[in-house]
Every structure is written in C-alpha cells, then in structure tokens.
Amino acid sequence: MTESKRILADVLLRPVITEKATALMEQRKYVFEVLPTATKPLIRAAVEEMFRVRVTSVNTLKPPRKQRRVGRFVGYRTRPKRAIVTLAEGDSITLFPDT
C-alpha cells in the first residue's frame, strides 16, 4: 500500500449509523465520521478510492462541543467532524453485508 492510499484510508473513521443517516441512504447520501483536519477534496478522494464510486458532493459539519462537569470543574467533550457524501446516480455503498 502506497503512502497516499494509506493517508486516504485514515481519513474516514467510521460510518454513522443513526435513524437520520439510515434514512439519507435512500437518497444516496452516506454519513461518515472523518478526521478533524480532513478537507472536502480529501474526503471525496478517500470515498472514491475505498468504495470505487463516483461522488457528486461532500458536505461537512462540526457539531458544537458538549460541556461536562466533574464537581466544580468544567470541561468540554469534543464531537467528531462528520461528512455527508452524495453519490452519483446508480452508485451505492454496502454498509450492511447480507448474511
């Protein structure tokens, strides 16, 4: 595996499996947690390389951090950056293999 392919493989952390994300799959939109430093072109290249599909658009979002309190001390828990990837007509990603 070359260095560039290894970097692309590290960009996508995991797919997001929620009710909303599952409903988006019917519209050829897939949600992934990505590295906080990942850019849209890098996410597009990673999805196209790993799943052999054509990506039409990439939307990213970074949810606000959550406040956590332990006694009198206040801290924050960061939330992971997410990418919503829209695929071209006729392409799909199999996240749940048939058993």
UniProtKB/Swiss-Prot annotation:
Coiled coil: none
Keywords: Ribonucleoprotein, Ribosomal protein, RNA-binding, rRNA-binding
A Gene Ontology biological process term: translation
GO cellular component, one term: ribonucleoprotein complex
Transmembrane segment boundaries: none
A molecular function (GO) term: rRNA binding
InterPro entries: Nucleotide-bd_a/b_plait_sf, Ribosomal_uL23-like, Ribosomal_uL23/eL15/eS24_sf, Ribosomal_uL23_CS
A Pfam family assignment: Ribosomal_L23
RNA-binding as UniProt keyword: yes
Top-level division of the source organism's lineage: Bacteria
Function comment: One of the early assembly proteins it binds 23S rRNA. One of the proteins that surrounds the polypeptide exit tunnel on the outside of the ribosome. Forms the main docking site for trigger factor binding to the ribosome.
Subunit annotation: Part of the 50S ribosomal subunit. Contacts protein L29, and trigger factor when it is bound to the ribosome.
HAMAP family: Ribosomal_uL23_B (MF_01369_B)
Family designation: Belongs to the universal ribosomal protein uL23 family.
Record-given protein name: Large ribosomal subunit protein uL23
Organism: Synechococcus sp. (strain JA-2-3B'a(2-13)) (Cyanobacteria bacterium Yellowstone B-Prime)
